[in-house]
């Protein structure tokens, strides 16, 4: 059977973390137009932490979600306008307003063990006639069987697709393979499976390829890998591999390369790449969007970013606990002072 992929671009949602949620609607429009012309199937637009994510805790955006989404809608001809919502941050009212602005696909995201909080939002999105995916973040923190049980819950609420979401870039190929197989064992045949990979261990393309080999049909990727931490699966090399594998998709490789180099890389105030800090995210299994918060704490308190991230991983922090990074830095500073004093 021929493998056909749905390529979901996340440059303008996960990629918001890479620019601290600061991008003009004009730039959003240019990137969306380029992605649409390049043939991607879906384009996700929102604050990095989803609808209503702009806050002191997560980081304020330069513009509202609505300004970004309107700019995107004005530049679409065929791609599915998508957004992301975390219950407890985004509300039903915001979901409904996104629909009014033209969003027709939504990913409802929860921590990997908290699928039950997604029921209302998935139900409302289905009621509106939207395409709905469940997004189980930090998927490495649950065993394959536990994660699959959570995926089954999202399916029961009405999700058309459920993702293995490697928010920390911690999964290896075997970890992805085991989780996709566990999903397939419990989900209905009609329910799609998606993969959302991060590059922190330099495995995002490999993990996405393994996922497709195991039956995944929806693949998240971004221009130049633009995303939290070391970035997401870079769309250009993934599409190149998909071509070599003979997988069917609608994307134009050269057009994606041009958009990545001409439009996205110039926006990055910090290179999106594997380096000592971003590698530590994957090594410690830390939520990728914690990078900029940890770097700010490091600069303020003089603690190595890697030391902070290792402690974040040891304590098992999850999305929404960004404020505890400062507490961790202060604890480490106090421990260093005690060590020097003794």
UniProtKB/Swiss-Prot annotation:
Family indicated by similarity: Belongs to the 4-hydroxy-2-oxovalerate aldolase family.
Binding residue positions for substrate: 13-14, 167, 196, 287
EC number(s) recorded for this UniProt protein: 4.1.3.39
UniProt-recorded name of the protein: 4-hydroxy-2-oxovalerate aldolase 5
Active site per the UniProt annotation: 17
Keywords on record: Aromatic hydrocarbons catabolism, Lyase, Manganese, Metal-binding, Plasmid
Organism: Rhodococcus jostii (strain RHA1)
Record-level Gene Ontology MF annotations: 2-isopropylmalate synthase activity; 4-hydroxy-2-oxovalerate aldolase activity; manganese ion binding
Binding, Mn(2+): 14, 196, 198
Marked site: Transition state stabilizer: 13
GO biological process: catabolic process; L-leucine biosynthetic process
InterPro entries according to UniProt: 2-IPM_HCS-like (IPR050073), 4OH_2_O-val_aldolase (IPR017629), Aldolase_TIM (IPR013785), DmpG_comm (IPR012425), DRE_TIM_HOA (IPR035685), PYR_CT (IPR000891)
Keyword Metal-binding: yes
Domain Pyruvate carboxyltransferase: 5-257
Alphabetized Pfam families for the sequence: DmpG_comm, HMGL-like
């Amino acid at each position: 059977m021929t493998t056909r992929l749905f390529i979901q671009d996340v440059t303008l949602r996960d990629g918001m973390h890479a620019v601290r949620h600061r991008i003009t609607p004009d730039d959003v429009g240019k990137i969306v137009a380029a992605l649409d012309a390049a043939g991607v199937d879906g384009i996700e637009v929102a604050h990095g932490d989803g609808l209503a994510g702009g806050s002191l805790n997560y980081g304020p955006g330069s513009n509202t979600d609505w300004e970004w989404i309107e700019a995107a809608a004005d530049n679409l001809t065929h791609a599915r306008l998508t957004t992301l919502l975390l219950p407890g941050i985004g509300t039903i009212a915001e979901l409904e307003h996104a629909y009014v602005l033209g969003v027709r696909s939504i990913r409802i995201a929860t921590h990997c063990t908290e699928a039950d909080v997604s029921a209302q939002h998935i139900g409302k999105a289905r009621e509106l006639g939207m395409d709905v995916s469940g997004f189980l973040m930090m998927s490495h923190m649950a065993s394959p069987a536990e994660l699959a049980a959570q995926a089954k819950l999202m399916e029961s609420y009405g999700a058309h697709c459920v993702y293995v979401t490697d928010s920390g870039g911690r999964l290896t190929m075997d970890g992805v393979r085991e989780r996709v197989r566990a999903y397939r064992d419990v989900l209905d045949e009609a329910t799609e499976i998606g993969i959302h990979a991060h590059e922190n261990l330099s495995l995002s393309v490999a993990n996405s390829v393994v996922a497709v080999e195991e039956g995944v049909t929806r693949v998240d990727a971004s221009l130049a890998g633009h995303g939290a931490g070391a970035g997401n699966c870079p769309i250009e090399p993934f599409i190149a591999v998909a071509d070599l594998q003979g997988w069917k998709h609608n994307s134009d490789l050269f057009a994606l390369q041009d958009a990545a180099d001409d439009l996205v890389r110039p926006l990055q105030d910090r290179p999106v790449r594997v380096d000592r800090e971003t590698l530590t995210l994957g090594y410690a299994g830390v939520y990728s969007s914690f990078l900029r918060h940890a770097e700010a704490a490091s600069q303020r308190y003089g603690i190595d970013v890697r030391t902070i991230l290792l402690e974040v991983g040891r304590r098992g922090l999850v999305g929404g606990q960004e404020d505890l990074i400062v507490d961790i830095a202060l604890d480490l500073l106090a421990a260093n002072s005690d060590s020097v004093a003794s």
